[in-house]
A protein has these predicted regions:
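Nucleotide/phosphate-binding site architecture used for ATP/NTP-dependent chemistry
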Residues: 1-267
Length: 267
């Protein structure tokens, strides 16, 4: 695990330096052929790198060193950057939270790919392969998932390849706006999300609550229900304008955007 920790830290520091140098927040100075340094306040980072065709500095993470001899850790780089950019304590804390969440996700990715060689990756199911990709190449903390704890990450983050069902609620039609393609109606939506057995269970729940055509079923991400809808729409739930149905239907696999889900039951 320590080897993975060192690797993701080196890769993160390289990404921070390269991205902010490209955006001209930091300035790289050539030391010799293919060897550079970047200063952040009183700290200096040195590394081997080549300048790409679009100006991007491709840093070799394994060559990163600090002038002080300190360990190569992304936390130190962020604290140095906070001084340079004059971040407030609150801003630094928020970025630190996103940093550590991203490092955890990157470690999980490395662990998930440990036993996969190039041939295995080529033959991997495309949706499974999506889960093993590194995410946005330029967004530095691309796995921040602010508000997600370890349980939520294991359930819903793509690198964990967890499968989950949607959480459904019913909402009175006059309380929402229904918008869809001409060839898609509510029955088509339900058919795309649950098999016959699940549809029977869903219909039984619908009838149990005495719901009729004046209501519409709405699918929700389970985290969205737990953390947002059940709390921020408490008034609608209390007044009976929204009714919780529960989890129904097929299992889904999260893609890189988190909000994009692949139906894992029908592949």
């Amino acid at each position: 695990v320590n080897a993975l920790w060192q690797k993701v830290n080196r890769e993160m520091v390289a990404k921070i330096l390269a991205e902010l140098e490209y955006e001209r927040t930091l300035r790289a100075e050539p030391v010799s052929a293919d060897y550079w340094r970047i200063s952040m306040g009183n700290a200096t980072w040195q590394f081997s790198a080549t300048r790409g065709i679009w100006g991007w500095l491709h840093i070799d993470p394994d060559t990163l060193t600090t002038a002080s001899g300190a360990a190569v850790e992304a936390e130190n780089a962020l604290l140095q950057l906070a001084t340079v950019l004059e971040m407030s304590d609150a801003q630094t804390a928020e970025h630190m939270e996103d940093l550590y969440a991203t490092l955890r996700g990157d470690m999980q990715l490395l662990q998930a790919r440990e036993t996969l060689d190039a041939d295995a990756l080529i033959h991997l199911d495309p949706d499974e392969l999506q889960c093993l990709m590194r995410g946005h190449p330029k967004f530095i903390f691309n796995k921040g998932r602010r508000g997600w704890g370890l349980d939520a990450l294991r359930l819903y983050a793509p690198e964990y390849r967890g499968r989950f069902r949607l959480h459904w609620v019913a909402v009175q039609r006059d309380r929402l706006v229904w918008s869809s393609d001409a060839d898609c109606d509510i029955n088509a939506l339900l058919s795309s999300a649950m098999d016959d057995a699940e549809r029977e269970r869903f219909d039984a729940r619908w009838q149990e609550l005495d719901l009729d055509d004046s209501w519409l079923p709405v699918p929700l991400h389970p985290w969205q229900w737990q953390q947002k809808i059940a709390i921020h729409f408490l008034a609608q739930l209390a007044r009976g304008e929204m009714v919780e149905l529960g989890e129904f239907g097929d299992e889904y696999l999260a893609q890189q955007s988190l909000r994009t889900l692949t139906n894992a039951s029908r592949r």
